[in-house]
């Protein structure tokens, strides 16, 4: 399992009493790296003392985005690169996911009919819907032939039971 982790590369900027802290992870576009990505997001969010249910939502949204990148942007070719940047700025948790695979048009993806989806026992196809449901903001930027970027942000609450006094 070959992947590069640049986990301890942190930038600290002080802006009006808010610490902005960024972490970065680079992995190859292999499904076995999804667990590495989940652990990376989980440990960063837990260190920031974000409530557990919010952490779980963020992890699921990131997992969906990265799965879509592996399957659709890279067509399951394992040597593509995925870069995940995590940033905590004030009361906002921001995830930026960059890839260099094929781009797509998210506006062409229709809202799913969940009842029909369930009746037809479909598998897959709910990634964008889940990301939009779990996160407060989902953006997609693409420079075709160069890179694609998914920006996920979540307004957060700190779990006060975990705050050290």
Where are the language model's segments positioned?
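Short acidic/polar alpha-helix capping motifs at helix-coil junctions
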Residues: 7-8, 34-35, 46-49, 58, ...
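Short, structured helix-loop boundary elements
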Residues: 31-34, 55, 59, 79, ...
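Conserved short strand/loop->alpha-helix "switch" segment adjacent to the catalytic nucleotide/phosphoryl-transfer site
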Residues: 41-63, 120-122
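Helix-loop-beta hinge of the Bergerat
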Residues: 18-52
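Conserved beta-strand-loop-beta-strand hairpin that lines the nucleotide-binding pocket
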Residues: 2-24, 70-165
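Conserved polar catalytic motif of the HATPase_c/GHKL fold
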Residues: 64, 68
